[in-house]
């Protein structure tokens, strides 16, 4: 099973890159998704190279870059700085955001602008895979809208990240996982219900079902399981949370 465990660096924005590397290594995780807002700002190649060198020296992977490029919203030239940082990190996967409105609030012109932008960046950087954040108040706020976007972009290097929607039912999230699994190579892992955050073990049964769905993909290629925003926002809890995540994988 090719599940890669890791940490999303924005989970602990106050920490330095060096501190992020240390706690990730100490927790026994495999990888870090570096965020493009603080630890590796888009276009800052010096920062990207320095962070990449330190991450590799610690024996950690960098399977994805968490950019804040918004399809159809960001200035078109901003993708160049994003792509440059991804290459400096030697990752082939870049997280992007799908517009700045929910799927039911967007106009057709706005939607088509986001689709055209996705096509543009995928064509400009065929060596990179661009994956949308699965998030409310974007075009991926519902898995059916997410599928429509993937189908309308229709580029081989365009896909999705997945995470459970904390404001929807478990049944909905299972439907979402089944629908998006073929297009997904990274998951953001947490245990939330609405605005309440819980220890990851609280959703052990739910994550067993989610990982069973993504297991088929993980038999053929790497699927990244990236811990995001711990229940207590305390770096000291990362080790326990990482052990919980590994126990999930052992039972798939």
PLM regions with names:
Residues 200-225:
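P-loop/Walker A phosphate-binding loop and immediately adjacent motor/lid segment at beta-alpha junctions
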Residues 5, 31-32, 65, 122-207:
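Acidic/histidine-rich catalytic cores of soluble enzymes
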Residues 10-17, 35-47, 69-77, 101-106, ...:
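Acidic-and-aromatic substrate-binding clefts and catalytic sites of carbohydrate-active enzymes
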Residues 186, 222-230:
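Conserved active-site loop/cleft motifs that coordinate metal ions or position small ligands
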């Amino acid at each position: 099973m090719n599940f890669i465990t890791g940490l999303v660096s924005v989970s602990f924005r106050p920490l330095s890159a060096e501190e992020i590397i240390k706690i990730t290594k100490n927790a026994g995780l495999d990888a870090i998704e570096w965020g493009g807002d603080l630890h590796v700002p888009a276009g800052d190649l010096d920062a990207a190279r320095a962070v990449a060198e330190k991450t590799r020296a610690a024996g950690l992977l960098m399977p994805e870059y968490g950019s804040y490029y918004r399809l159809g919203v960001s200035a078109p030239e901003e993708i160049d700085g994003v792509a440059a940082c991804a290459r400096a990190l030697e990752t082939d996967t870049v997280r992007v955001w799908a517009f700045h409105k929910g799927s039911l609030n967007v106009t057709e012109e706005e939607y088509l602008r986001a689709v055209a932008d996705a096509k543009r960046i995928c064509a400009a950087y065929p060596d990179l895979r661009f994956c949308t954040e699965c998030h409310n108040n974007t075009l991926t706020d519902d898995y059916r809208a997410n599928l429509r976007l993937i189908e309308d972009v229709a580029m081989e290097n365009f896909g999705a990240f997945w995470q459970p929607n904390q404001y929807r039912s478990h049944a909905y999230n299972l439907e979402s996982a089944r629908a998006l699994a073929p297009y997904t190579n990274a998951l953001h892992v947490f245990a939330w219900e609405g605005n309440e955050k819980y220890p990851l073990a609280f959703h052990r049964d739910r994550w067993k079902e989610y990982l069973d769905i993504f297991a088929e993909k993980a038999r053929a290629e790497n699927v990244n399981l990236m811990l995001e925003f711990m229940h207590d926002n305390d770096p000291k809890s990362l080790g326990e949370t990482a052990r919980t995540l590994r126990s999930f994988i052992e039972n798939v």
